[in-house]
């Protein structure tokens, strides 16, 4: 072990970190090396390696004790939402179909009192408009996004040569496109709509991967409310879904650290794009890496998570600005017309097991299909296999299997006896709400989190990661779904989930966190204030300004001040620790990408050193050498 990696060195780094005295860029990079590791094999990429830095976390134990001492032990009942004047609301969502669907019932409920626009990928326009909601196209191709995530196995920093050569530049271009489109979604008419109705957002609702949310809110001085289906707020209860560590494997302090590290590494890769967006499009000042990585936490932006308290309790660290709702089902059963062949298959025997991986892309669809078919046969089970984006079922199915395309989960799952899927939040919620035993085969990210939640709830067997999926493992999982204890637990859980109205809870959360009554017109509280009269010191809607305050000096009224914030708590300390290190990692990768673009077998390092022959064609080794050069 080198001097920089010795326990004594890590002790010194941890002590300096907690005292805000780690000023050396070289030491910060070394600290990042202590917290991460570059791995080969199916999990290529940058991963958390907390065992290597265990002594660092030992120094944080007193901080954690103080942090947890005063935490509330019981949830605080949420206040009633205030009376809210009609608003123009934009809901920005990036992701797959399952990511978009929960926002449609929320949007429809909000549209009873407000003007609502859902901004998402162009291919989801028909789904949004069928629900009677306005649409605006955001950038990015969800298919390409999913292919990238599957290739990298959800790695924060990809390191395979092909990824660095082709995928990283394409992903960065896609993020830049998404950022630019989020501002247009807040301020412009739908470019493809039948009527070019003006639009300016009074409230932004978004999921975290839409990137531009908080920056658009700052430029417009509007409230922001985040909604997501996976944990995105630091907690000691479980790790960040993209930290690539198994929930329950590490201590609370490591779980808490994982959120700050992931945020910093993500921002190291996109910070320059965000700053371009802020300065060139929004006319805002640039932000530092450490500040940008923690904006949502620093401003305590209201968050609603779409799962029930009974399944994943709200962590004690999460304050009153964070609410839990419930899974939200996008109901389609009442309009679905099934083909007769599907009805005949369902009527011909025992209820089948559903198998499908939704929007996940498979590297070898034929091999995966054969594994599924064989496991169903060995388990003496009938199956319905969904093709999805993985293109399953591309080989001739046996008589006990029916291959389907797009069928609504709420219709189909009511006719199945168990489900097997990738662990996406949408499919997980649909299966559990239907009261079905659930087998999760996670590929990346939050799918591992939901696989663990299902198993811990007793509603299914242990999850089977895709790189460990075998015919034997899948057969055993199908057999486990027949156990009476599993079936009873799944049925009980489904009944409890169906009894909670997640849409009402989510809308309640959005409205109660609005900065009312500061949004009201002082003279007509039923209208939104848009101007402020200096002479009278009152907030005004446009109508009152024209009638009663003609000739007065009025200014645009800003009911949210996104003034400067600063990192705080352990995440803030972590920003001080590895902010420069993450930026240095980004700079190193930025140098690595153009060099492999011009030469497949060589990398020009920052000091001009040429790689050894042993490094040629091996980006993992190149990245290790780059980190070691610090």
Give residue ranges: language-model regions.
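Nucleotide-sugar-dependent glycosyltransferase catalytic domains
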Residues: 2-71, 122-352, 357-382, 393-396, ...
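Nucleotide-activated donor-dependent transferases that construct or modify glycoconjugates
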Residues: 81-96
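A short, glycine/small-residue-rich beta-strand->loop->alpha-helix junction that serves as a flexible
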Residues: 93-104, 361-362
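A donor-sugar binding/catalytic signature common to diverse glycosyltransferases
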Residues: 99, 404-453
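Nucleotide-activated donor-binding/catalytic signature segment of Leloir-type glycosyltransferases, i.e.
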Residues: 380, 390-408
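Cys/His-rich, Zn2+-coordinating zinc-finger modules
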Residues: 519, 526, 539-579, 584
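Canonical RING-type zinc finger of E3 ubiquitin-protein ligases
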Residues: 525-536
């Amino acid at each position: 072990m080198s001097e920089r990696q010795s326990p004594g060195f890590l002790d010194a780094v941890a002590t300096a970190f907690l005292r805000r005295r780690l000023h050396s860029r070289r030491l910060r990079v070394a600290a990042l090396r202590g917290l991460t590791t570059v791995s080969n094999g199916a999990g290529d990429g940058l991963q958390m390696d907390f065992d290597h830095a265990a002594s660092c976390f030992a120094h944080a134990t007193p901080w954690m004790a103080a942090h947890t001492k005063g935490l509330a032990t019981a949830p605080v009942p949420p206040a009633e939402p205030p009376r809210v004047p009609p608003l123009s609301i934009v809901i920005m969502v990036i992701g797959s179909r399952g990511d978009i669907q929960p926002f449609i019932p929320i949007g429809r409920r909000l549209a009873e009192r407000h003007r609502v626009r859902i901004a998402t990928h162009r291919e989801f326009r028909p789904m949004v408009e069928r629900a009677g909601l306005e649409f605006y196209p955001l950038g990015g191709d969800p298919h390409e996004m999913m292919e990238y995530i599957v290739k990298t196995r959800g790695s924060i920093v990809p390191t395979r040569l092909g990824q660095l050569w082709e995928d990283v530049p394409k992903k960065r271009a896609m993020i830049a496109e998404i950022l630019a489109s989020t501002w247009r979604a807040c301020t412009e008419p739908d470019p493809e709509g039948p009527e070019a109705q003006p639009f300016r957002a009074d409230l932004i609702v978004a999921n975290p991967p839409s990137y531009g949310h908080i920056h658009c809110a700052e430029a417009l001085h509007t409230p922001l409310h985040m909604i997501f289906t996976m944990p995105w707020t630091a907690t000691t209860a479980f790790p960040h879904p993209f930290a690539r560590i198994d929930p329950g494997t590490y201590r609370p302090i490591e779980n808490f650290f994982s959120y700050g590290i992931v945020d910093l590494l993500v921002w190291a890769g996109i910070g320059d794009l965000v700053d371009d967006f802020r300065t060139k499009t929004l006319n805002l000042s640039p932000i530092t890496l450490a500040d940008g990585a923690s904006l949502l936490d620093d401003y305590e932006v209201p968050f609603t998570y779409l799962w029930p308290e009974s399944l994943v309790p709200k962590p004690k660290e999460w304050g009153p600005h964070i609410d839990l709702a419930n899974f939200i089902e996008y109901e389609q059963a009442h309009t679905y017309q099934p083909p007769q062949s599907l009805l005949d298959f369902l009527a011909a025997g025992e209820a089948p097991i559903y198998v499908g991986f939704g929007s996940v892309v498979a590297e070898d669809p034929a091999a995966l299909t054969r594994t599924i078919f064989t496991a169903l046969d060995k388990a003496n089970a009938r199956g319905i296999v969904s093709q999805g984006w993985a293109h399953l079922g591309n080989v001739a199915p046996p008589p006990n299997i029916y291959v389907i395309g797009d069928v609504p989960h709420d219709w189909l799952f009511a006719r199945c006896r168990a489900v097997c899927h990738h662990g996406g939040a949408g499919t997980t919620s649909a299966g559990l709400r239907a009261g079905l035993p659930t087998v999760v085969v996670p590929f990346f990210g939050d799918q591992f989190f939901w696989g663990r939640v299902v198993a811990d709830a007793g509603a299914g067997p242990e999850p089977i990661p895709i790189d460990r999926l075998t015919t034997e493992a899948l057969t055993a999982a199908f057999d486990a779904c027949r156990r009476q204890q599993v079936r009873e637990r799944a049925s009980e859980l489904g009944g409890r989930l169906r009894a909670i109205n997640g849409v009402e809870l989510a809308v309640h959360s959005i409205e109660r966190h609005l900065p009312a009554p500061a949004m009201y017109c002082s003279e007509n509280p039923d209208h939104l204030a848009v101007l402020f009269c200096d002479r009278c010191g009152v907030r005004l809607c446009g109508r009152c300004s024209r009638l009663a305050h003609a000739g007065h000096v009025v200014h645009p009224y800003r009911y949210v001040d996104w003034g400067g914030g600063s990192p705080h708590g352990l995440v803030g300390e972590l920003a001080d620790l590895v902010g420069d290190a993450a930026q240095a990692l980004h700079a190193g990768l930025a140098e690595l990408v153009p060099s492999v673009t011009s030469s497949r077998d060589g990398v020009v390092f920052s000091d001009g050193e040429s790689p050894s022959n042993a490094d040629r064609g091996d980006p993992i080794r190149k990245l290790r050498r780059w980190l070691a050069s610090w």
